[in-house]
Amino acid sequence: LAERQLIDASDRRNRLLRAQIDLWRQNPPVKRIVAAGTTAAFPLMKELVKTVLSLEKGELYLAGIDKFLEDEAWEKIDETHPQHELKELLDYLTVRREDIPDLQAPENFGREVLISEVMRPAATTEKWRDIAGKKIRHEAADGITLVNCADMREEALTIALLLREAG
């Protein structure tokens, strides 16, 4: 690539992100800047989100962040957990989950609590014994189907077929 005076896509992306970060730090925009829907999975993206939050009118919205999980369990999220990248981002930003505004109010509050419990970090599953105290209504499970699969291949095929039917 160097012989042809070219750079690869990730290098280009990083240069563009660095330029945007530097521009906003040197000349903060007066208009509203929103960072939304990112997990900021790589360092420069995290830095860009941090820069957005430092702006006078900078805002951050993260869809799908689990705000129902208690803090003790949140701290036990490991790299295998679906919320891990969001947790890493918030830790980097030193922002609490509660401080991230919701994009919209939950349509089914009970379902949100149920999903939070289902996705609870493995190190805290002893808390499942207390789930009755959360008063999750039966309607929270409406539309949810349990499919038992023999292996990961069958699971992947089942998911693919269900997504095809839904689409």
State where each predicted segment sits:
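Nucleic acid-machinery interaction/catalytic patches
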Residues: L1-G167
